[in-house]
Amino acid sequence: MVKPLPRLRLQGFNNLTKALSFNIYDVCYARTEEERQRYIEYIDEQYDADRLTQILTDVAEIIGANILNIARQDYDPQGASVTILISEEPVIDKKQAGKELISDAVVAHMDKSHITVHTYPETHPQEGIATFRADIDVATCGVISPLKALNYLIESLESDIVIMDYRVRGFTRDVKGKKHYIDHKINSIQQFLAKNVKSRYEMFDVNVYQENIFHTKMHLKDFDLDQYLFEERAKNLSFKERMKIETLLKREIEELFHGRNLSE
């Protein structure tokens, strides 16, 4: 739960911009080129624009935002994008979102409050590794907090690795003229994760408190080879094959978690 600071009487609108960014990775091993292609097709179907729209619509509901407009697109050969414009106050009926022209007042608000997702399936050309990355951004202006959607987003996607950034920008002024650069208490993004999520992941923080920048990386603690194999079972592989695949997968996970290639 996001704990606000003692209630402030503001001069006008709360001008703080809060932005939560996710990189979520799913890692898989598919032995043959045909299996890797089927993995891409599977991911493309699982996370098409319709499914992503539903996830982001749920996010808007969770954080208490009103939907202004929805734009979505599936790409050829793979991938999808969805952008939802949101506000604190309802402007048009939810059923009409994406069907009506938006007023100038709403257009002026677009760059401030939105939820976006882009997907990036890809495969290694030789080694059998296949990955799916979803980039999600939730940016709000005012009292709405994107942190409320943390756990839902992690659970909604196949999250082997999660990289999160949260920042608060701008200021809001109280009736006495004093500027406030944040309106809630936070020491770490981890504060807002559910216990069952924290118990499953190893987590690492890099926070710059004086700049209101918070960064958390997570990867699953337990490694079950069957969870990473596509159209295959570990029991059907030789010991040598299992060790080779496990080494490849663990290396891929470490490199994605740290954001750099490891030396051979």
From Swiss-Prot:
PANTHER family: S-ADENOSYLMETHIONINE DECARBOXYLASE PROENZYME. The record marks 112-113 as: Cleavage (non-hydrolytic). The lineage of its organism: Bacteria, Pseudomonadati, Pseudomonadota, Gammaproteobacteria, Lysobacterales. The active site is at 113 (schiff-base intermediate with substrate), 118 (proton acceptor), 141 (proton donor). Its EC number is 4.1.1.50. GO terms for cellular component: cytosol. The keyword S-adenosyl-L-methionine applies. Catalyzes the decarboxylation of S-adenosylmethionine to S-adenosylmethioninamine (dcAdoMet), the propylamine donor required for the synthesis of the polyamines spermine and spermidine from the diamine putrescine. Pathway: Amine and polyamine biosynthesis; S-adenosylmethioninamine biosynthesis; S-adenosylmethioninamine from S-adenosyl-L-methionine: step 1/1. Keywords: Autocatalytic cleavage, Decarboxylase, Lyase, Polyamine biosynthesis, Pyruvate, S-adenosyl-L-methionine, Schiff base, Spermidine biosynthesis, Zymogen. One of its GO terms (molecular function) is adenosylmethionine decarboxylase activity. One of its GO terms (biological process) is spermidine biosynthetic process. Heterooctamer of four alpha and four beta chains arranged as a tetramer of alpha/beta heterodimers. The gene is speD. It comes from the Bacteria. Its cofactor is pyruvate. This is S-adenosylmethionine decarboxylase proenzyme. Pfam families: AdoMet_dc. Is synthesized initially as an inactive proenzyme. Formation of the active enzyme involves a self-maturation process in which the active site pyruvoyl group is generated from an internal serine residue via an autocatalytic post-translational modification. Two non-identical subunits are generated from the proenzyme in this reaction, and the pyruvate is formed at the N-terminus of the alpha chain, which is derived from the carboxyl end of the proenzyme.
